[in-house]
């Protein structure tokens, strides 16, 4: 699986740990995010990722900022993008099962790296249930 990932300055360190985890699981990662940790304008880093997901509905993304809100709002402006802010494993599972989320939005200031990696793992391994959720 090829995972797209992006972040602002608040998510730089968490992103590095997530990228390391994803690669260790045998997936490839394309980084659209900030690597400097210097203050940046998050839309500049989220638009390219969201555009890619919008153009390829088989694509999966992870976006990270301090709260998860700003990056999610930018991503969800694109047709076909379903970005979900998740701060626990249950939300990650439901976002995939019931909402077919294709982008995981993480609040870096509210998660440990261990919690974030558990959420990423659930998001990447949970399938959409379809059925009654398909019509939404």
Question: What are the roles of these predicted feature ranges?
Answer:
Residues 4-24:
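Glycine-rich phosphate/diphosphate-binding loop of Rossmann-like nucleotide-binding domains
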Residues 4-6, 10-11, 89-135:
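C-terminal binding/interaction regions
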Residues 16-19, 73-77, 97, 117:
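Short amphipathic alpha-helical segments
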Residues 28-39:
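A short beta-strand-loop structural module common to alpha/beta enzyme folds
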Residues 38-47:
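Structural motif
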Residues 48-85:
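Helix-adjacent hinge/juxtasegments
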């Amino acid at each position: 699986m090829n995972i797209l990932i992006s972040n602002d300055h608040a998510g730089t360190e968490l992103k590095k740990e997530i990228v390391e985890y994803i690669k260790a699981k045998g997936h490839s990662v394309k980084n659209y995010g900030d690597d400097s940790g210097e203050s940046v304008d998050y839309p500049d880093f989220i638009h390219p990722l969201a555009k890619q997901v919008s153009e390829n509905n088989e694509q999966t993304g992870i976006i990270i900022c301090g709260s998860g809100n700003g990056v999610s709002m930018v991503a969800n402006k694109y047709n076909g993008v379903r970005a979900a802010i998740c701060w626990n494993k249950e939300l990650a599972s439901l976002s995939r099962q019931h909402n077919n989320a294709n982008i995981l939005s993480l609040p870096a200031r509210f998660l440990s790296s261990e919690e974030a990696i558990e959420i990423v793992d659930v998001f990447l391994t949970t399938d959409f249930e379809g059925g009654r959720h398909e019509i939404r």
